[in-house]
Amino acid sequence: MQRAYESSSFSRLAGRALACAALGVGLAGCPPAPPASQFPTADDALGRMHACYDCALGVQGTAKVDLVAQQGRVKGDVYLFAVAPDRVRFDVVSPFGATIYTLTSDGRDFKLADQEQKTFFYGPATPCNLARFTQVPVPGHALVSLLRGEAPVLVHTREAASIRWDGGHYLLDLPSTRDAEEEIQIGVHPDDFDKPWQEQRVRVLGVKVVQQGIPLYEAELSDHKPVTTAPPRIDEEGIDDPVPPSGPECTAEIPHSIRFVVEHTEDDVLFQYKDGEAKWNPPLIEGTFTQPVPGGMRRQFTDCDRAP
């Protein structure tokens, strides 16, 4: 059985090489052939994706952010926490070291301290409130998933979902039961092409969501690298006990470059994790996902999902 498998694998690779040579496209001209063992269904591929991130409950990291929106462009560093299912914190610092924004959401309450406008926005943790900073109208759980490298998955039926190999990666089409469609690009780890599909590690490369025929957002994920679990948080004065990591040991990959694009508004935001700065399952202290009103700021309630 092993000899037959190796012969089949050799024939597949040889056939691909001959096809590339015949077309005269050179070494880089042909996309990778599909793995020897392929996912039977879209849900099988999604199951492997979830399995690869079972240990990654949340991420803490420092990233470069480059946000291009109708209101202008913002560049700086962002210190972020994103913890499943829907808790986030962003502290955005300018190139000069000044804090520009602090956004917190515990999945229920949204708060944004805008130092430039001297305004403290607060309200429910709706997609459009989160988009005040991210410019991407996605729910908190979807944002957390993408920042961890996992695709949010729309509600769908197994029978309606489809999967095919398309130019070096899998392409999953998920017609939702709620008048939406999702397209997910999933790649296979280069070291796992000859493993059974049940053992292959996968990488989410792209996500596109369309709502009622209108493109909602696209996400491009690249530069995948393994990272480790964060160490315990130690009180330097030795008064409080160490705070342990919020999850198990984990060495899953994370995409170090995540780009969000919203076609109808032309908004574009790029997160690039700094090497060595991203950690899984960070220690969490009370108040991480909320914030007090800074002095000297006016308060403004916002609930843009609610009709006037």
Name each model-derived stretch.
Residues 29-77, 243, 302-308:
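N-terminal leader/targeting segments and the immediate start of mature chains
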Residues 86-142, 271:
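An acidic-aromatic
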Residues 56-60, 75-77, 83-87, 98, ...:
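Extracytoplasmic
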Residues 149-153:
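Scaffold/interface architecture of coatomer-like assemblies
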